From Swiss-Prot:
Protein name from the UniProt record: tRNA/tmRNA (uracil-C(5))-methyltransferase
Similarity comment: family membership: Belongs to the class I-like SAM-binding methyltransferase superfamily. RNA M5U methyltransferase family. TrmA subfamily.
Function: Dual-specificity methyltransferase that catalyzes the formation of 5-methyluridine at position 54 (m5U54) in all tRNAs, and that of position 341 (m5U341) in tmRNA (transfer-mRNA).
Superkingdom: Bacteria
PANTHER family found in the cross-reference section: TRNA/TMRNA (URACIL-C(5))-METHYLTRANSFERASE, TRNA_TMRNA (URACIL-C(5))-METHYLTRANSFERASE
Catalytic activity, reaction form: uridine(54) in tRNA + S-adenosyl-L-methionine = 5-methyluridine(54) in tRNA + S-adenosyl-L-homocysteine + H(+); uridine(341) in tmRNA + S-adenosyl-L-methionine = 5-methyluridine(341) in tmRNA + S-adenosyl-L-homocysteine + H(+)
Gene3D superfamilies: 2.40.50.1070, Vaccinia Virus protein VP39
Residues binding S-adenosyl-L-methionine: Q186, Y214, N219, E235, D295
GO molecular function, one term: tRNA (uracil(54)-C5)-methyltransferase activity, S-adenosyl methionine-dependent
Enzyme Commission number, as recorded: 2.1.1.-, 2.1.1.35
Taxonomic placement: Bacteria, Pseudomonadati, Pseudomonadota, Betaproteobacteria, Rhodocyclales
One GO term of the biological process aspect: tRNA methylation
Membrane-crossing segments per the record: none
Source organism (scientific name): Dechloromonas aromatica (strain RCB)
Amino acid sequence: MPLPTYDPADYPTQLATKVAHFEQNFAPFGVANTAIHASAPLHYRMRAEFRIWHEGDDLNYAMFDPADPKQPITLETFPPAAESICHLMPRLRDKLRGNESLRRRLFQADFLATLSGEMLVTLIYHRQLDEAWEAAAREMAAELGIGLIGRSRGQKIVLDRDWVLEGFELNGRQLRYKQVEGSFTQPNGGVNRQMLGWACQQAAGFGGNLVELYCGNGNFTIALSPLFERVLATEVSKSSVHAAQYNLAANQVENVALVRMSSEEFSNALAGREEFQRLKDIDLEPFRHATLFVDPPRSGLDAVTLELARGFDRILYISCNQETLRENVIALQDTHEIKASAVFDQFPYTHHLECGLLLTRR
């Protein structure tokens, strides 16, 4: 993980620069009055990964300056990370320093925190882990009150569970999300809540049915589900589908049909070009002119999915790459126009800016 530069005094200026770039990028499509959702200037990251730098019997967390990638910068703490991570870092380091089984050939430490107060740490080694490691790791995890996983090549030791349970309030509902180690989760918990709130605000009053592609662990699915009669959500990752199934049950959501398939497969199914056993119990007809929600990878929507999107009256689009978002808007501009826009600063002090658009049929 490269070392970011961060100065809370500079944050408003940096955010304003990113917002100006977005508005300039989308001005030709009539974007105006963009809703701006800022991050906390510090303690915003719910995930953090650090190399472990050894000097004799000592060790420290380390990151690297991209301008000098061979020279480690050792850290006592990391202010962009959640306060719970910052509080844990020195305590965990001291435990690791004091135990040869835990320290030997330790390469990396990954932290996964939640707004609800849970913590999971993954320790990655350049050696096989043995019973002595497991005994020491169990004792340390109990003393620190954390979940712990040990990894090495071809080996994964989970001491309790390989996930955390996130929980927060949104629009009067208490939402819970299973977040699995190694799977994608939103890195900025505070901004994620703002994204969910904006999406719900835009969808309020739509009614009818919702199709969601790339649903992940159900982050948006669960937040949006009360606003629609029925939801059909798709996701290709097996671990994300399992997490989404857990999350739907944990939040008592009963109007969602979740199918493991790619956006291209679903597009072909809805167009009648292919039939899939996974969809045999789902009537697709009510979803043909529903609302479409997409939160695609950085590559944006492919040509097949864009063709699918043209058939929907409303498209809610969350993007982590405004360049591919712009390309997709150009491809859709003959059928859809932008009605609302928002930016979400998931990654302060970087050039990245999460974007949200509501597009409606012309």
